[in-house]
A protein has these predicted regions:
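N-terminal core-binding DNA-recognition domain of tyrosine recombinases/integrases
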Residues: 60-75, 84-174
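Intrinsic, low-complexity N-terminal interaction/targeting segments
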Residues: 177-180
């Protein structure tokens, strides 16, 4: 079975279609992931709402975006809101929860952000992001996980990607880096 993920715009939302096909190429299932982000003005302050495809505010995001990082620069808050939208889109695609993430899923998330294909069954997307953008997304995740007090989350572990690299990824670039 293969899984393909395609991205499309719906208004100002970025959505994903996840299609699973059998070995013969017949579609087994097709689902849409659309995590929406809205900004509203409340007493002269910008507040962010992040909600799922059922139009329910995603637990934890309101407090993080509107209280925890309230004193950050407006552009930083907006970037972090977009980062959380990407994170929850990925969570919907792989059908897991944030507190169940493994090192392998973190690596898949990095590839998802880059828009690159892996040797796994998830096809690539068309968006390519540079390393500074990826690092900003990962920093947002670490801060958000810390805010949520997720004890078993491997997001907070400070481990080299050489160690976290799962078997479906090539380790050659990292081996070359070590041997220099």
């Amino acid at each position: 079975m293969t899984t393909s993920v395609s991205e499309f715009k719906e208004g100002n939302a970025t959505c994903f279609v996840v299609e699973e096909k059998d070995e013969a190429g017949k579609t087994i299932s097709k689902r849409e992931i659309c995590i929406r982000l809205r900004s509203i003005q409340v007493q002269g302050q910008t507040r962010y709402l992040l909600y799922d495809e059922n139009m329910k505010v995603i637990p934890g995001t309101w407090g993080y975006l509107n209280d925890h990082i309230a004193l950050k620069a407006p552009n930083t808050r907006k970037q972090r809101a977009y980062s959380l939208r990407q994170l929850y889109s990925f969570i919907g695609i792989i059908r897991t929860s944030l507190d169940q993430f493994t090192a392998s899923e973190i690596m898949q998330y990095r590839q998802f952000l880059k828009g690159l294909n892996t040797k796994s069954s998830i096809d690539s997307r068309t968006i390519l992001r540079d390393n500074s953008t990826i690092n900003m997304h990962l920093e947002t995740m670490r801060d958000y996980v810390s805010y949520l007090h997720l004890e078993n989350s491997c997001f907070r572990e400070s481990v080299s990607s050489r160690i976290l690299l799962p078997s479906e990824y090539s380790a050659e670039p990292f081996e070359k880096e070590v041997s220099k």
